Structures are given as structure tokens and as C-alpha cells.
UniProtKB/Swiss-Prot annotation:
UniProt cross-references to PANTHER family, sorted A to Z: PEROXIDE STRESS RESISTANCE PROTEIN YAAA (PTHR30283:SF4), PEROXIDE STRESS RESPONSE PROTEIN YAAA (PTHR30283)
Source organism per UniProt: Saccharophagus degradans (strain 2-40 / ATCC 43961 / DSM 17024)
Superkingdom of origin organism: Bacteria
Protein name, UniProt field: UPF0246 protein Sde_3824
A Pfam family assignment: H2O2_YaaD
Length: 256
């Protein structure tokens, strides 16, 4: 199985890191091309493009200006240890063993507006560039046009390497839109997490994001390789809901 997840807006470059062997991202030439265009923007342009405050616009302007193809311990850290949103709280990569990191390196990909598709231990300089950003570039009107089939091609290459025909989609819709399902050499399985509220089960964003991270960790820590094994997921009170599921969508529910 190959798991795909979204990145996070919040970053952590301060927490002491475990000793891990880092790797180099595969699509850095593409990243550099994007950065070249982003460096032309003024701080206020960054704010407008990303719909963020002037303070955050200046922060990300500075990040773009300082970005380079030289990745060091001083300016970068492994992606899975740099992102710090709800998904990554659930994933809790700081608790990974060496075996967990090794499995994740082969079976987990983080979709990224700037880096395309990252392995967990790929070094990453801090940035913010959401996949849905309408940043016009040499390849088209937005980042979906920029990445084209490259992310899908990278996933297909990894599916072949690990001998799998299953992609576990734990990414948001915004990010999974960068993948071309018809060109993907594998079945897409999408776990969905719902909470009991006001007399029915519904998706609550905060809990769903954390649960995507939990499911990713569950697969990694248990070294799962078969879709059927996902149905045993029972962390944080979730259980597989057969009645609400269909072939490709696995629904997990809980009553708090």
C-alpha cells in the first residue's frame, strides 16, 4: 500500500529531532522553478495570493527569498518532522522507531504545492504554498497545471517499487486533486472518519484530520500491506462501519 497525506500550514523547526538518515526530495528542479517565480512577488503580493495577513505575507516572502537548492541541518529538516498540523498530531512521527521510519519512507508520500510529493525523510525548507493557490506560472494558471502528471507519475513509480496496486488516500480533496486517478496504476481506497453528533454521524474537520494521521500511523506501525487489514483500525474509539462503507470508501465511526 502507498499512503498519501496532505502537508500542514503550521511548521515546527524547533523541537529536537531524533537521529534519522535524511534524503533529498526528487522534484527539486520543479521546486526551484516555482521559487524563481515566487521570488518576484512583493510581500503584499504574497498576502493577496494566499489570502493571509500582512505579517504572514512578510514571513513567507522572506522564506521564498531565502530558499535555495542547498539543504542543510541549519535551514531544513525532514518533512514528516517539520509539518505540525492536526494530521501530524495523529501521525506522531516523533514516536517512530527506525523500522517505522524505514517503512514510512517506502509507503508514505506527502503531497506538496512546492515540493510535489515528499518522502517522510526528504529535507524540506520552510514554506507555505497550498496546492489550491492560483499562482500563474510557465506551465499554466495554477499549481495543478504546474504539476500536471508529475505527482501521479511519482506515485506510480513507487507503487511499482513496493509491488502494490493500492493507494490509501488520506489527503484532503484540495491536495488529492493533484493526482490523476485514471492514470494511477492502482485502486484508490479512501478512509472516512465520522463523529456522532446531533443524532447522526458527520465529518468534523478537526477530528477527521487527526484521524487521517492516526490511520497513517496505524498502517506504518503495524506494517500493513492489505486493504482488509485497515478495517481493524480501532484507535481513539473508531470502529469500521460496514453499513456506511462501500468498495473504495471505508467509513469509520465513533460516539464520543
Amino acid at each position: 500500500m502507498l499512503i498519501v497525506i496532505s502537508p500542514a500550514k503550521n511548521l515546527d523547526y524547533d523541537t529536537p529531532m531524533p537521529k534519522v538518515k535524511t534524503t533529498k526530495a526528487a522534484m527539486l528542479e520543479d521546486s526551484a522553478e516555482l521559487i524563481e517565480g515566487l521570488k518576484q512577488l512583493a510581500p503584499q503580493d504574497v498576502s493577496k495570493l494566499m489570502h493571509i495577513s500582512d505579517k504572514l505575507g512578510t514571513l513567507n516572502y522572506d522564506r521564498f527569498q531565502s530558499w535555495s537548492l542547498t539543504f542543510t541541518k541549519a535551514n531544513a529538516r525532514p518533512a514528516v518532522l517539520a509539518f505540525n498540523g492536526d494530521v501530524y498530531v495523529g501521525l506522531d512521527a516523533y514516536s517512530f522507531t527506525d523500522e517505522d521510519f524505514a517503512f514510512a519512507q517506502d509507503h508514505l508520500r506527502i503531497l506538496s504545492g512546492l515540493y510535489g510529493a515528499l518522502r517522510p525523510l526528504d529535507l524540506m525548507q520552510p514554506y507555505r504554498l497550498e496546492m489550491g493557490t492560483k499562482f500563474a506560472n510557465n506551465r499554466g494558471k495554477d499549481l495543478y497545471a504546474f504539476w500536471g502528471s508529475k505527482i501521479t507519475d511519482a506515485l506510480n513509480k513507487q507503487l511499482k517499487k513496493v509491488g502494490s496496486e493500492t493507494v490509501v488516500n488520506l489527503a484532503s480533496n484540495e491536495y488529492f486533486k493533484s493526482v490523476k486517478p485514471k492514470a494511477l496504476n492502482g485502486e484508490i481506497i479512501t478512509p472516512v472518519f465520522k463523529e456522532w453528533k446531533d443524532g447522526k454521524y458527520k465529518i468534523i474537520s478537526f477530528f477527521a484530520k487527526k484521524a487521517r494521521g492516526l490511520m497513517s500511523a496505524y498502517i506504518i506501525k503495524n506494517k500493513l500491506t492489505q486493504v482488509e487489514q485497515l478495517k481493524s483500525f480501532d484507535w481513539d474509539g473508531y470502529t469500521f462501519n460496514k453499513a456506511m462503507s462501500d468498495g473504495s470508501e471505508l467509513v469509520f465511526t465513533r460516539k464520543q
